[in-house]
Swiss-Prot record:
<keyword id="KW-0406">Ion transport</keyword>
<protein>
    <recommendedName>
        <fullName>A-type ATP synthase subunit E</fullName>
    </recommendedName>
</protein>
<comment type="similarity">
    <text>Belongs to the V-ATPase E subunit family.</text>
</comment>
<dbReference type="GO" id="GO:0033178">
    <property type="term" value="C:proton-transporting two-sector ATPase complex, catalytic domain"/>
</dbReference>
<dbReference type="GO" id="GO:0046933">
    <property type="term" value="F:proton-transporting ATP synthase activity, rotational mechanism"/>
</dbReference>
<dbReference type="InterPro" id="IPR038495">
    <property type="entry name" value="ATPase_E_C"/>
</dbReference>
<dbReference type="GO" id="GO:0042777">
    <property type="term" value="P:proton motive force-driven plasma membrane ATP synthesis"/>
</dbReference>
<keyword id="KW-0472">Membrane</keyword>
<dbReference type="Pfam" id="PF01991">
    <property type="entry name" value="vATP-synt_E"/>
</dbReference>
<keyword id="KW-0375">Hydrogen ion transport</keyword>
<keyword id="KW-0813">Transport</keyword>
<keyword id="KW-1003">Cell membrane</keyword>
<comment type="function">
    <text>Component of the A-type ATP synthase that produces ATP from ADP in the presence of a proton gradient across the membrane.</text>
</comment>
<comment type="subunit">
    <text>Has multiple subunits with at least A(3), B(3), C, D, E, F, H, I and proteolipid K(x).</text>
</comment>
<dbReference type="GO" id="GO:0005524">
    <property type="term" value="F:ATP binding"/>
</dbReference>
<keyword id="KW-0066">ATP synthesis</keyword>
<dbReference type="GO" id="GO:0046961">
    <property type="term" value="F:proton-transporting ATPase activity, rotational mechanism"/>
</dbReference>
Amino acid sequence: MVSFEDLLNYSLNEEKNKITEEFKKILSEMNQIIDEAYAEVYREYSAKITDLVNKNNDRIRGEIAKMEIENKRLISKEMDYWIENVKENAKKSLYEFVKTDNYKKGLESIISREVSDGSIIYCSPSDQKSISDIIKKKKISCKIVVDEKIVGGIKIYYPDKSLSKDFTLETILNQVFDDIRDKIAQILFGE
């Protein structure tokens, strides 16, 4: 026969086993809920962090692009400064060139070829006498007007045609300089 105590122990063990099984199930469900909640929070914050990182990367790329453009602008500005410096030095050398025999021969050639009776010649103050001598020698009837802005060379105006031709050294220098600007940049900057 089974004693009361054995029966009680058996009954208690049965209940204990049921409670333990229920507790294991509850613990397993709680762990699953915690794992799912953790995974959801992890996904949510991972997405937020990824979004934040992407936004910051886009902002940084934008800043880098702005800086590169600004850098190119500054470099271009500096290159222009040095190229203009070369041009100004070339312009200063014109003052020496107008004193040479080659210049005077070139001036006479232009006058012989381009100036006709009734023309108006604009020239520098230093060239006025030379031009006057050339037109007397060539027997051309024209007017000479001094232009303080001209370093060398001449401008010719044909009133009958309302036409003007510019043979000033400044204009020639500007045209030549514009044509070879890229070559000058290559020499100065290796580009």
